[in-house]
Amino acid sequence: MAIIASTFGTGLSYAGELPFKPVTGGEVGRKQQRMVVVRAEGGGGINPEIRKNEDKVVDSVVVTELSKNITPYCRCWRSGTFPLCDGSHVKHNKANGDNVGPLLLKKQ
């Protein structure tokens, strides 16, 4: 899995062509549009090697100050309610033979 572009402080590092048109000296006063695109490369799976002997990798963290008893956070990046999990990993796991699951924050 590789990251195509990422930001560091106020700078921008990237691989490939810029996804925006940079502002040049003749375009003073125009706002510069910036976009960072991050894309996973490789096979269809999100989890290539972690705990592959389990049907679904789910980790739980106990936290004392939460408003709900349990809060699932997405780790497959496919949730329509990101960063919260909506169960999209189930379809992804079936289609790709993967075993990614949510991070569960539990109230103590």
Swiss-Prot record:
Tell me which InterPro entries the record gives.
CISD1/2 (IPR045131), FeS-contain_CDGSH-typ (IPR018967), MitoNEET_CISD (IPR042216)
Q: Where in the cell is it found?
A: Plastid, Chloroplast; Mitochondrion
- What keywords are annotated for this sequence in UniProt? 2Fe-2S, Chloroplast, Iron, Iron-sulfur, Metal-binding, Mitochondrion, Plastid
User: What interactions and quaternary structure are annotated?
Assistant: Homodimer.
The entry marks the following residues as binding [2Fe-2S] cluster, namely C74, C76, C85, H89
Q: Per its record, how is this protein called by name?
A: CDGSH iron-sulfur domain-containing protein NEET
Describe the disruption phenotype: Late bolting, early senescence and increased tolerance to abiotic stress.
Cofactor(s) this protein requires: [2Fe-2S] cluster
Record's function text: Plays an important role in plant development, senescence, reactive oxygen homeostasis, and iron metabolism. Acts as an iron-sulfur transfer protein.
GO molecular function terms listed in the Swiss-Prot or TrEMBL record? 2 iron, 2 sulfur cluster binding; metal ion binding
Q: Which GO terms describe its cellular component?
A: chloroplast; chloroplast stroma; cytosol; mitochondrion; plastid
**Which SMART domains does the entry link to?**
ZnF_CDGSH (SM00704)
Q: What would be one Pfam family of this protein?
A: zf-CDGSH
For this chain, the family text in UniProt reads: Belongs to the CISD protein family.
Is Hydrolase set as a keyword in this record?
no
Its Gene Ontology biological processes? Answer: leaf senescence; reactive oxygen species metabolic process; regulation of autophagy
Give the co-factor note: Binds 1 [2Fe-2S] cluster per subunit.
Record note on what altering H89C does: Increases 2Fe-2S cluster stability 10 fold. Loss of iron-sulfur transfer activity
